[in-house]
Regions:
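Conserved small/polar residues in nucleotide/adenosyl-binding loops
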Residues: 1-5, 239-244
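Active-site loop/helix belt of alpha/beta enzymes
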Residues: 6-12, 18-139, 143-147
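Short, surface-exposed secondary-structure boundary micro-motifs
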Residues: 173-175, 193, 200, 224-228
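Short, well-ordered loop/turn sites that connect or cap secondary structure elements
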Residues: 181-182, 189, 216
């Protein structure tokens, strides 16, 4: 701020308004509108925008969102009464972009949908056709065939039962961010088919059953996240958290 003053330039600022997130921002009151107007009158501040944040836009019940929009509109009116015009108004996050046509205003803030992922299962997906932008691939580094009764990986938590099991070792593990919780539960894609993970996932390797996938060889591409043929594994399926945001921002 002081540097801008010395340069005789204005610092652009966006006013935060608390409409129900109870995180940051001015309250929607006459007093706080007065304070915001004082900021707008400062010689080296240009009040370029005003924003708030939806707390429940990705839920089916939009009652709370309606209350937030009403508060935001009221703050806009309170500032207008004080001669303050806001050029850039923004309230819509990813779910808001999909749900509220009348409150997109001059700017929106796309988050999770930038990754091609829906904010939740409760938004109206038909309004926006999203394609996941994330993919994660590795390679087969070893292939072997074993008989029945053979333990796989740490603790031998998986023991082969078939007369012959073909096992491919994949160069990826929990040190790369792959969830170890998917040991003996998850799958990868090879040649457009699902290959179940067998045994515990190691630090930088995992074993998968490719008995039913013909011609798997070393250096074959393994899809951990993404699409191969008609099969898809999304980042949401990979992680056990109910929110896709944990995986896209970690």
């Amino acid at each position: 701020m002081y540097k801008r003053q010395r340069q005789n330039r204005k610092a652009k600022a966006h006013l935060a308004v608390d409409t129900g997130m109870t995180r940051i921002g001015f309250q929607v009151t006459e007093h706080d509108a007065d304070e915001a107007a004082k900021i707008a009158d400062l010689p080296h501040i240009e009040l370029e925008g005003m924003f708030t944040h939806f707390s429940c836009a990705d839920q089916e019940d939009k009652t709370y969102c309606s209350m937030q929009m009403e508060k935001y509109d009221k703050m806009t009116a309170l500032l207008a009464e004080r001669g303050v015009t806001i050029p850039l108004r923004h309230i819509c996050n990813s779910a808001g972009i999909m749900e509220f046509d009348d409150h997109r205003f001059e700017m929106v803030r796309s988050g999770i949908i930038t990754y091609g992922i829906y904010p939740s299962e409760e938004v109206k997906k038909e309004r926006l056709d999203l394609i996941p932008a994330l993919s994660w691939k590795s390679h087969v580094i070893h292939v072997k065939e074993v008989g029945p009764g053979i333990g796989v990986s740490y603790g031998a938590t998986y023991v082969t039962e078939k007369p012959m099991t073909r096992i491919a070792t994949v160069s990826a593990g929990y040190a790369d961010g792959y969830p170890r919780a998917l040991s003996n539960q998850g799958c990868v894609l090879i040649h457009g088919k699902k290959a179940p993970i067998i045994g515990r996932i190691c630090m930088d390797q995992m074993m998968v059953d490719v008995t039913d996938i013909p011609d798997v060889q070393v250096e074959d591409v393994v899809t951990l996240v993404g699409t191969d043929g008609d099969e898809t594994i999304t980042i949401c399926l990979l992680y056990t958290s109910p929110s896709p945001r944990d995986s896209t921002s970690s």
